[in-house]
């Protein structure tokens, strides 16, 4: 009964045991190609796997390693069963997708086994297409790169052409823009300073000068005849400037340039003497002096850039006689403007004080001289202080020494001499001497010879004037400098350059001492100080905008370091860097420091300066832009000033980045000060970033202003070594500064050389300190309606304190001075670290500098030659190191 139930169906009949694959094979639809067998040994599976992975991922929508590996494993067999593969894949991919997948995969395998390489022809075609596409893409990329490169090349060429144009044309543009505008604007500033509507005009002229040399030319157009001459001289100078800009990069070429500088100095002295004769008449007409000073500013800048010395000799003779143009040219914008105005004022004072010396250059501004002359007795203090207050003067002094007539003026008028020195020293010595010291390497074109000159003069002149000055009062030194000036002008700009240098060192030592003394006297007699410091520095810089010139002049010694930095820049952009040099002694300072120290940054600026000159040129062009715009022109002037002033700021910025921006910004703040007639308005224009810069840059100028802008700036100048000292002997910022100042003072010859090394970093650090401490001062001045005056008053009070400190520090500085001389080499390596200490040490260094400089007046003269040699070597080493590392 039950038998049938269990026997009813066989296993085959029971679907539970049926061969399901057979059923599926019968039921499923397969692509026709699957009928063909594939020999996997002939197939390059590695080429197929990427396609399988891609396809499965497309089907599933995600990358399933299990499925992919399952497929790979099935294909590992020599002769895989295509239908079974499809059946097996149906569970992972649905039936339709599995069929499609196998329909695509199998033809690939079939073509691959037919191909020798085992690669499907489709893949080969795809590869070919891909290769073609890649080639096309590469070609496109290459063409794009080429286009980019071409564009870059074009841009570079355009920039080079522009730079060349700026150099050739803009020996006018730059020299016109920066120097000429400065000079023109400086003459304008003279008028404006006089009228106190100078700043607006200054801006206008700055703009016009900056927007186009045409405007500058238009400004000087009143003296088109002078311009042609200037053009000739400027062209010659531009040639020399252009060469020097490049040559300023190599120290050796600079020395070569020096000889041309001397020759060109003589020629320019002749030309400038001619222009002096004109300038007296033109000094009568400010427009003439403006156009002249602008025109001279161009030639002078070329002269400067060519041979800052030659310009300085010329400037010395001519700036004295043509003081407004010349000094103004030295202050190219700020200095020249302010300095000329100031110079005119002071030269007026000087004229009154000594009409003979100021008569030629001061006769233009005899009226202003009386005011300065009022300070004339203080100016004598200023004269001494002009040593201290005129670190720029010191440079100017050295530079005026080249021009005997100017020196007589100086001698007649301490202020005039100081101012002349400031403007000139800062212009010419600042550029020549400071460049000599600091840019001896970078500036060596003017500076190398100047350094040798200074060394020579430091031997002859320092022996003469140094000992005399050390033994005698500043007047002997001045007379000695006069003699040296005359002899230098007689012997040529070479002796004047030499005199500049020794005088500078003497001036640094003696004058700084005297400056300190005068700063003492100034601080004791705020009116003299304010007159010279505040009026001359401040008025130049800030209130009259001549004080800025003065400050810039006073900074000019420090700016010469900056010049160093911008020797090529100053040379190329010497117009703008000269302002830097002039206006920001701190800036110059720090720039010089950078130049010296980071000859690389400075070289970047200066030696690297050929490129940085573009930057500076760019900066000049920006400056030009600034000039173009009222606030930009202020910025430009201010920025040159700021660059000079903010050398500290700029030095910090430049340390980090020689960014022309910081320079510009700093420039613009200085410009604020420069446009002291409306410095604050400009401050507002330039002050957006420059207000801080203004605090920093203005601070440094104010510091200069406040400490006796010229005195402190110069101290900074000589402190440039001091910051090194500060680093080397950071016993205290003050002691460091004392040491630094003693080094810079007693080692002023030494600092002069060391300024190559030490000043670069000290300048930077000092500049930062100038930035910081001046920034503090500048803050109050900036906040106060008359920041310059406040800073001057503060500077007066601080100077008094510093003078006291200086007295105490003298002994320390003397000791430290010797130590620092040894340390300077080591300190040169620590410019950055010195920067912080320099903030405090910058003030104290200034204080200390006066003492050591006074003390070192006699000592440094003997040691100046040796010190200068050592310092030059150190500076060259530091510059080379900086050139090697910072540019990279």
UniProtKB/Swiss-Prot annotation:
Chain intervals with Basic residues compositional bias: 170-206, 277-325, 332-347, 528-554, 561-585, 614-629, 642-656, 798-823
Keyword Nucleus: yes
Pfam families assigned to the protein according to its UniProt record, in alphabetical order: PWI (PF01480)
InterPro entries, alphabetized: PWI_dom, PWI_dom_sf, Ser/Arg_repetitive_matrix
GO CC list: spliceosomal complex
Record Gene3D superfamilies: PWI domain
GO biological process: mRNA processing; regulation of mRNA splicing, via spliceosome; RNA splicing
Low complexity bias (residue ranges): 348-364, 473-496, 586-598, 697-712, 728-749, 763-775, 826-843
Region annotation (Disordered) ranges: 139-888
Intracellular or extracellular location(s): Nucleus
Residues covered by the PWI domain: 27-126
GO terms for MF: RNA binding
Function, in words: Involved in pre-mRNA splicing and processing events.
PANTHER family, per the entry: SERINE/ARGININE REGULATED NUCLEAR MATRIX PROTEIN (PTHR23148), SERINE_ARGININE REPETITIVE MATRIX PROTEIN 1 (PTHR23148:SF0)
The protein, known as: Serine/arginine repetitive matrix protein 1
Source organism (scientific name): Gallus gallus (Chicken)
Gene responsible for this protein: SRRM1
């Amino acid at each position: 009964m039950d038998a049938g139930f269990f026997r009813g169906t066989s296993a085959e009949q029971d679907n539970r045991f049926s061969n399901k694959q057979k059923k599926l094979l019968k039921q499923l639809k397969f692509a026709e190609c699957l009928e063909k067998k594939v020999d996997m040994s002939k197939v390059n599976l590695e080429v197929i796997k990427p396609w399988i992975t891609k396809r499965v991922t497309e089907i599933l929508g995600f990358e399933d390693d299990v499925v992919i590996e399952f497929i790979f494993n099935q294909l590992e067999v020599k002769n895989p069963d295509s239908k079974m593969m499809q059946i097996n894949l149906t569970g992972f991919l649905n039936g339709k997708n599995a069929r499609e997948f196998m329909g695509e995969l199998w033809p690939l395998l079939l073509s691959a086994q037919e191909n020798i390489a085992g690669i499907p022809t489709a893949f080969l075609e795809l590869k070919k297409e891909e290769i073609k596409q890649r080639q096309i893409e590469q070609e496109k990329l290459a063409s794009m790169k080429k286009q980019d490169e071409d564009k870059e090349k074009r841009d570079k060429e355009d920039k080079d052409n522009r730079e060349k144009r700026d150099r050739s044309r803009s020996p006018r543009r730059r020299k016109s823009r920066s120097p000429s505008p400065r000079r023109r604007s400086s003459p304008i500033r003279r008028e404006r300073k006089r009228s106190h509507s100078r700043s607006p005009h200054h801006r206008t002229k700055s703009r016009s000068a900056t927007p186009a040399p045409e405007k500058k030319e238009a400004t000087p157009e009143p003296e088109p005849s002078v311009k042609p001459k200037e053009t000739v001289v400027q062209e010659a100078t531009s040639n020399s400037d252009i060469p020097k800009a490049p040559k300023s990069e190599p120290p050796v070429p600079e020395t070569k340039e020096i000889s041309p500088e001397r020759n060109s100095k003589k020629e320019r002295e002749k030309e400038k003497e001619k222009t002096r004769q004109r300038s007296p008449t033109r000094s009568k007409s400010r427009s003439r002096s403006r156009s002249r000073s602008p025109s001279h500013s161009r030639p002078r800048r070329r002269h400067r850039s060519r041979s800052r010395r030659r310009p300085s000799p010329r400037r010395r003779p001519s700036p004295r006689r043509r003081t407004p143009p010349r000094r103004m040219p030295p202050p190219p914008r700020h200095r020249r403007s302010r300095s000329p105005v100031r110079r005119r004022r002071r030269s007026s004072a000087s004229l009154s004080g000594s009409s003979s010396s100021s008569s030629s250059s001061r006769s233009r501004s005899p009226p202003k001289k009386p005011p300065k002359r009022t300070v004339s007795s203080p100016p004598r203090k200023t004269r001494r202080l002009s040593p201290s207050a005129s670190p720029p003067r010191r440079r100017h002094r050295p530079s005026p020494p080249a021009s005997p007539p100017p020196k007589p003026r100086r001698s007649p008028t301490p202020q005039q001499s100081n101012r002349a020195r400031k403007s000139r020293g800062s212009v010419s010595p600042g550029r020549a001497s400071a460049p000599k010291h600091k840019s001896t390497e970078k500036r060596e074109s003017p500076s190398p010879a100047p350094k040798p000159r200074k060394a020579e003069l430091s031997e002859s002149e320092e022996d003469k004037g140094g000992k005399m000055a050390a033994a005698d009062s500043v007047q002997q030194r001045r007379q000695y400098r006069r003699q040296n000036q005359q002899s230098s002008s007689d012997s040529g700009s070479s002796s004047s350059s030499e005199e500049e240098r020794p005088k500078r060192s003497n001036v640094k030592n003696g004058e700084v001492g005297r400056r300190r003394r005068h700063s003492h006297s100034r601080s004791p007699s705020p009116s003299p100080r304010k007159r010279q410091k505040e009026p001359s520095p401040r008025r130049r810089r800030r209130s009259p905008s001549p004080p800025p010139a003065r400050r810039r002049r006073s900074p000019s010694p420090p700016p010469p370091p900056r010049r160093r930095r911008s020797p090529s820049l100053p040379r190329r952009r010497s117009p703008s860097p000269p302002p830097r040099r002039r206006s920001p002694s701190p800036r110059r300072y720090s720039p010089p420091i950078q130049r010296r120290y980071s000859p690389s940054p400075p070289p970047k600026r200066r030696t690297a300066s050929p490129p940085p000159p573009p930057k500076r040129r760019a900066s000049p062009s920006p400056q030009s832009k600034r000039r173009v715009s009222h606030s930009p022109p202020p910025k430009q002037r201010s920025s040159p000033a700021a660059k000079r002033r903010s050398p500290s700021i700029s030095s910090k910025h430049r340390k980090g980045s020689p960014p022309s921006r910081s320079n510009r910004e700093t420039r613009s703040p200085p410009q604020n000060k420069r446009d002291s007639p409306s410095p604050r308005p400009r401050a507002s224009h330039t002050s957006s970033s420059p207000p801080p810069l203004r605090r920093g840059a203005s601070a440094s100028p104010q510091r200069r202003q406040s400490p006796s802008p010229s005195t402190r700036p110069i101290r900074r100048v000589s402190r440039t070594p001091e910051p090194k000292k500060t680093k080397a002997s950071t016993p205290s910022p003050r002691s460091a500064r004392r040491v630094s100042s003693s080094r810079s003072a007693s080692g002023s010859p030494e600092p002069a050389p060391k300024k190559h090394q030490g000043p670069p970093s000290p300048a930077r650090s000092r500049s930062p300190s100038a930035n910081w401490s001046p920034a503090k001062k500048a803050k109050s001045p900036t906040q106060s309606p008359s920041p310059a005056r406040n800073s001057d008053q503060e500077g007066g009070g601080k100077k008094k304190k510093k003078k006291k400190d200086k007295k105490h520090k003298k002994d320390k500085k003397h000791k430290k001075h010797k130590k620092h001389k040894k340390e300077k080499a080591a300190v040169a390596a620590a410019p950055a670290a010195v920067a912080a200490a320099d903030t405090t040490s910058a003030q104290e260094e200034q204080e200390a500098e006066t003492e050591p400089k006074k003390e070192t007046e006699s000592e440094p003269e003997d040691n100046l030659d040796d010190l200068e040699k050592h310092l030059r070597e150190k500076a060259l080493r530091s510059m080379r190191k900086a050139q090697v590392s910072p540019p990279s």
